[in-house]
């Protein structure tokens, strides 16, 4: 948390751009490794490979780079998670819709990677793991948190992994 606060101070003083940090290969690679390992453990713990996840990224650039890492790097011999990148400027509306259907109904997508889309009004009961890489506030935060609280099978609620220190909101 001290490192996070120090970085925030540097960003506020305009000594460094936040994008430089959160889109840096080393940062995104560590994020990818953590999420991959955590998500596999989560599914194993709950004995349910149908559970889905969502990563809310800090920037569109971070989302694109994270998606690239998910599609090119295999962690510890695990079969790669199937991910979909949902951004307004990537793919057309029909393609994004097919990815969302793949997540919600067909279970052909394990993890959605988003920046500004699907934070409100997205209803997918199998979404049980939410990774916050970005601070959201007020109504948007509340809406995003409720994405994981739909009943699904034996799961009454979902879980949040907070990389952005949302409790400050």
Q: Can you say where each PLM-predicted feature lies in the sequence?
A:
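Conserved RecA-like ASCE P-loop NTPase motor core of nucleic-acid helicases/translocases
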Residues: 49-59
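Residue-level preference for the first positions of well-ordered beta-strands
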Residues: 32, 52-54, 111
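Conserved RecA-like P-loop NTPase helicase motor core
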Residues: 82-169
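Short helix-terminating capping/connector loops at secondary-structure junctions
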Residues: 45-50, 76-81, 153-156
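Interdomain helical connector at the RecA1-RecA2 junction of SF1/SF2 helicase-like NTPases
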Residues: 1-50
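Conserved helicase motor "Helicase C" RecA-like lobe of SF1/SF2 P-loop NTPases
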Residues: 58-89
